[in-house]
Every structure is written in C-alpha cells, then in structure tokens.
Amino acid sequence: LIRSSIAIGLAVFLVGQSSSEDASKKLAVDESTFRCLTEMEKTELGAYFVDNVLGNIDATLAIANSADGGEFPAGSVISLVPSEVMIKHQTGWNEATADWEFFELNVSSEGSTIVSRGTTEVVNQFGGNCFGCHTQARPEWDLICGSDHGCAPLPITRETIVNIQNGDPRCVNKASDA
C-alpha cells in the first residue's frame, strides 16, 4: 500500500510538472520547423541529426559531438529518425523535461505533420513513451539517449535505423524537385 501510494504520488507530481510550461519561454514550432534529415547536421558518430531553430548550430553540434555530454542550447533540434524529434525550449520552459519538447510526426514527400507533441505524454510509433525512455539518460547527456548514455536499448538495429534515416520521404521530394 505504501509503495502504491508513493508511485501514485510520483505520477501525480510528474503530470503536474509536465503542465508547468512557461509560455514566455516556449519557442515557435510548427510543421514547417521540421526538415529533411539531410538538411540537418549529422553528428560525428553519425548516430543522429541536429539543427537549431535559433541559428546556434555550432553550439548544438559541439554538445552533440562531445564525448562528455553537456547541456544543449535553446533551439536545439534532435532527430534519430524522421518521425521522432526533440526540441529544446528556452531555459525555464519546463523543468521536468529539462526544457525539451517531444514530437511524433507523420512524414511524407509533402512534408511533416505533427501527430503528437508535448512533454511527458508523447508516445512513439513503437508504443514507447518518449520522456520515459529519455529520462533514463545520465544527467550529463541532457536527456539524449545513446548506446552508452544509460537509456534502454532501442527495439531496432542500427542498420534498420540507418535505413529509416536514408528513407526520409521529405528528402526524396527535394531530390526530385531539383
């Protein structure tokens, strides 16, 4: 009974925190924010792609490529696969998620459509809660999962991830327009 009460209390606390968004710290994000992966910067290890909606790509890349981790700057955009994206809002936007917002997208040659966005409630195409997984990352990784960052392994292989990345339909449309 005590364990259940603690679990329920923690869940209520987290849900309460997920709603603690400071609108003045929120970045403007809409469907046009999300670009073809090849228009973003690939990290040195090639594991994921980054961008920065505020133009601070050098600082975002420095943290993404750091062997020691660090805190990503506001505006950072992180994407492992085309349909899953994290965006870092201004400091103080949402303490529970270290100012990250999670997005599940539908992507096509026409662009991106936001299916779901939020803090602790977004679920990906595999049925996993984005925040639930990313919160397992050790503090120095700023909620970014990697093979040695403390997160549970993904249910798909690296080869499958690369195939999904290479198949971003938004990029195919750009290539055929050229």
List PLM regions with ranges.
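N-terminal post-signal-peptidase region of extra-cytosolic proteins
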Residues: 54-69
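Bacterial Sec-dependent signal peptides at the C-terminal "C-region" and cleavage site
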Residues: 15-22
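Sequence context surrounding c-type heme c attachment/ligation sites in exported
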Residues: 22-45, 69-178
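Generic detector of short alpha-helix boundary/capping microenvironments
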Residues: 4-6, 63-64, 121
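Bacterial N-terminal signal peptides
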Residues: 5-13
